[in-house]
UniProtKB/Swiss-Prot annotation:
One of its GO terms (cellular component) is plasma membrane. Residues 438-443 are annotated as: Selectivity filter part 4. One of its GO terms (biological process) is potassium ion transmembrane transport. It comes from Haemophilus influenzae (strain ATCC 51907 / DSM 11121 / KW20 / Rd). It is a multi-pass membrane protein. Keywords: Cell inner membrane, Cell membrane, Ion channel, Ion transport, Membrane, Metal-binding, Potassium, Potassium transport, Transmembrane, Transmembrane helix, Transport. Coiled coil: none annotated. This is Trk system potassium uptake protein TrkH. Residues 110-115 are annotated as: Selectivity filter part 1. The lineage of its organism: Bacteria, Pseudomonadati, Pseudomonadota, Gammaproteobacteria, Pasteurellales. Residues 219-224 are annotated as: Selectivity filter part 2. Residues 98-109, 110-115, 206, 207-218, 219-224, 235-250, 305-320, 321-326, 335-346, 347-359, 424-425, 426-436, 437-443, 456-467 dip into the membrane without crossing it.
Length: 487
């Protein structure tokens, strides 16, 4: 284990992250809301912390191994989340406890979208911008965004990319060099954000709301600058902009990269449609949106079919992309609709996207595995390999997906048990852990709108669940294996 080299890298990344505090400080200056001091203090403290980590180890530039990448990813997320709490603690309004600030910061960085803050409409613009900006930074994963500069630091970036990337096919690279992948991600991610902000602005949002919501829409984070979430605007055009860009953020970004490289060369739509996961993902979205829309109309929750489709598409997409935007009180929806929303959140979006959940590719492979087992019962001698497109999946790949599913269940019930010990009842604990572990945001029970009333200790458990969900279990759980720390 190259501990000193790892500390050096963490220090450099923390120093880079400290610079992000200057952006909301500039926003505070523009609006004159008095928040600049808190962000400048947070900037200085973060910069000092990064320097103290980096300087004693700055001569250690050993090449990282694969196992080192996992520790860097987890350590950086924990350190980053801790530093991200500083502005929230330094502000006089809102006045947050340490546990609440930790919860809010990790919810932003992991793009969960759950919140312990209320009265958003009356908060300083700079703190509202900061929450949105945190989700934008966390959307693609801080480490993936940083790998473009990792080669400049004297180490290779492949291990970090593999540890942070999501989805079971993450060993497949979209481009030969990881720095090129990261740069392409930056260009695409930033371009989509700008397009989303323009679309919001043209649809009637003011510039501040348009920029803020573009951050949380592309990242599928779900934070809003208003207590009523996206429902504050109550406008169909804004709802459709939200739905479309959430879906774009829910697509595997390797497909976006391929489409970006193929501009002007071939039919871009074919580039997406030939991907089995994308076809499964889009088909499931259309089916779920249709069912939810018809259900909303059938239950009389909307006035006409157009409103049903508009609101059904938004609410279903928000849950399935684990974004966290809400226009309905989920806890008071008919059980059938609520169940569909929960199922969609469990499935999530595509691997390699900004969404949470199990991911569409894993769901597709598990479905094919179940189908094969059922056919094997009928034809015991049948040899039927599982294929995704033209690729035949190795047994090891299928085993890893089942292992992920089992780990997901174990972590879920472990967190539920821990939250119950913190004082929450079973139903609320199950709903809250589901919301945080899948990074979906809205919970069930009394936390369906805000986590402000949960015990302080439970907020720390939820923060752990968010990190587990964001790093897809294994990247974090592997650190608890004793053999990981052996030479």
């Amino acid at each position: 284990m190259r501990i000193l080299s790892i500390i050096r890298i963490i220090g450099i990344l923390v120093m880079c992250f400290s610079g992000t505090m200057l952006v909301p400080a500039f926003v505070a200056l523009i609006y004159g809301d008095g928040g600049g001091k808190a962000f400048m203090q947070a900037f200085m403290l973060s910069l000092i912390a990064g320097t103290l980590l980096w300087w004693p180890c700055h001569h250690h530039k050993q090449e990282l191994r694969s196992r080192d990448g996992f520790l860097i990813v987890v350590a950086f997320w924990l350190v980053l989340g801790s530093l991200a709490t500083l502005p929230l603690l330094l502000f006089d309004s809102p006045h947050l406890t340490i546990a609440s600030a930790v919860f809010e910061a990790f919810s932003g960085l992991t793009t969960t979208g759950a919140t312990v803050m209320t009265g958003l409409d009356n908060l300083p613009k700079s703190i509202l911008f900061y929450r949105q900006f945190l989700q934008w930074l966390g959307g693609m994963g801080i480490i993936v965004l940083a790998v473009a500069i990792i080669p400049l630091l004297g180490i290779g970036g492949t291990q970090l990319y593999r540890a942070e990337s999501s989805g079971p096919l993450k060993d497949q690279k979209s481009l030969p060099k990881i720095s090129e992948v990261a740069k392409a991600l930056w260009i695409i991610y930033a371009s989509l954000t700008v397009l989303c902000a323009i679309a919001y602005w043209l649809s009637g949002m003011n510039l501040f709301d348009a920029i803020g919501h573009s951050f949380s829409t592309i990242s599928n984070g779900g934070f809003s600058t208003h207590d009523a979430s996206i429902g504050y605007f109550n406008q169909a055009s804004i709802y459709w902009v939200t739905t479309i860009f959430m879906l774009i953020g829910g697509v595997n970004f390797s497909l976006h990269i391929s489409a970006f490289l193929a501009l002007g060369k071939r039919n871009i739509w074919r580039n997406y449609w030939k991907d089995p996961e994308f076809r499964f993902f889009l088909t499931m979205q259309i089916i779920f949106i249709g069912i939810v829309s018809l259900s909303l109309y059938g239950y009389g929750l909307v006035s006409d079919i157009n409103e049903a489709v508009t609101k059904g598409a938004l609410q279903l997409t928000s849950m399935s992309m684990t974004a966290g935007y809400t226009i309905f009180d989920i806890d008071n929806l008919p059980p059938f609709i609520g169940l569909l929303l929960v199922i969609s959140a469990v499935i999530g979006g595509c691997g390699g996207s900004t969404t949470g959940g199990l991911k569409a590719i894993r769901t597709l492979i598990l479905w094919k595995q179940i189908d094969r087992e059922l056919h094997s019962l009928i034809h015991p001698n049948l040899v039927q390999p599982i294929r995704i497109g033209k690729n035949r999946l190795a047994p090891r790949m299928i085993e890893s997906i089942w292992a992920f599913f089992i780990i997901f269940i174990l972590v879920y019930w472990g967190c539920v048990f821990a939250v119950i010990l913190c004082g929450m009842n079973t139903f609320d604990a199950m709903g809250a852990v589901f919301a945080t572990l899948t990074n979906a945001g809205p919970g069930l029970g009394f936390i369906h709108e805000s986590f402000i009333g949960v015990p302080e200790s439970a907020k720390l458990v939820f923060s752990f669940a968010m990190i587990c969900g964001r790093l897809e279990m294994f990247s974090l759980i592997v650190l608890f294996i004793p053999s990981y720390w052996k030479k």
